[in-house]
């Protein structure tokens, strides 16, 4: 349903040759799976400030020709609900990706809640604040250039490498989390980052690309490959055996609950889908128990 809307917006494209769909560190496989070669980016950290139960540090890092801004939040204590014995030196970390139009500052309510549980987070101002233009990205891809949605995934992977370089954080206990479209990026990034321990996806779903393409009659292989490359459902087989924890309101005001159920059904175990009743799109306090349990399963 969702990807069908995208296809409707752009219409059926002409046969534009994909002259270049890979580079030394970026490629898209024939099945639509994106792949990146990631290394730790250059980054700068500001002076830390104390905010409630944690330290807050502004981050700037270079990624694919742009400067990306983030907020690093480190809890004052290292014990987490998943590490009751406190026998590890490092704090587990989360790459936290807001939904479209949401800034890193507005995402700090959830980041503070995660700090309460003992998790460090790095929250990004995503490119275009997470707003996507599928038509423009498709044109870029067919021309052989990187779409913005691909680069956003690169940004998330780079953020994970920054977390791994922070002395207080355990580099082997990193997960991805996101809300709405940020959760789609989080799922894909987790699939590509084999070192990560799982993904927490709030108020999201995949695009159902294969069914939508079949219904629309699109035959251009590169167009189909692009749509599959931005669909988190393409990457679900790469998540297991790491956990996928989905949390969704049955009264979500943007994404119907059955779409989340469809995506969840395509994932392999271990997986969980927690439903709540709040009438919002995105995080609400009713999700706290599911978040705590889902993260505990990733870090235990």
Model region roles, listed by residue range:
Residues 256-264:
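Short alpha-helix in the alpha/beta-hydrolase fold that links the catalytic acid
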Residues 250-255:
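Acidic catalytic loop of the alpha/beta-hydrolase fold
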